[in-house]
């Protein structure tokens, strides 16, 4: 099993952070391996599925993530219902003075041959999460900068 946890403060309102996290088509701009994310429904809510195309090396992998918890401005939980890797990711938002605290927790379990790949992925996974969250923080905080 691969696990990661990240907590950071972002100088943006919970509304802005929530809108950013739930703008799935924009995921390729900050989530490293995502090439495309397409929402299957006209409205985001519990049960909504998102088709995600990821690029691992030269290999394109299609997958589905499902929203399993939906508490606007507070909590978003997404799970992959099937595949070589089963992921369970939780974003929790908390208003704080000057912005929003974001807590992220993820567990990924490989099945079959992918179980062997966990060992290779685990080493760099936290660095990847740290990089993506730094990118998210920069993108949200620079929205307020005027030139």
Task: Explain the meaning of each model-derived region.
Residues 7-11, 38, 53, 66, ...:
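Generic structural detector for well-ordered beta-strands
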């Amino acid at each position: 099993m691969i696990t990661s946890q990240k907590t950071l403060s972002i100088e943006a309102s919970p509304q802005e952070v929530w809108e950013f996290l739930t703008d799935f088509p924009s995921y390729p701009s900050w989530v490293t391996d995502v090439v495309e994310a397409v929402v299957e429904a006209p409205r985001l809510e519990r049960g909504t599925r998102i088709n995600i195309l990821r690029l691992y090396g030269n290999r394109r992998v299609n997958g589905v993530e499902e929203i399993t918890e939906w508490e606007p401005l507070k909590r978003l939980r997404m799970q992959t219902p099937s595949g070589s890797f089963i992921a369970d990711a939780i974003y929790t938002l908390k208003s704080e003075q000057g912005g929003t605290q974001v807590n992220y927790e993820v567990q990924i379990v490989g099945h079959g041959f992918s179980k062997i790949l966990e060992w290779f992925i685990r080493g760099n996974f936290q660095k990847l999460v740290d990089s993506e969250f730094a990118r998210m923080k920069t993108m949200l905080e620079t929205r307020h900068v005027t030139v």
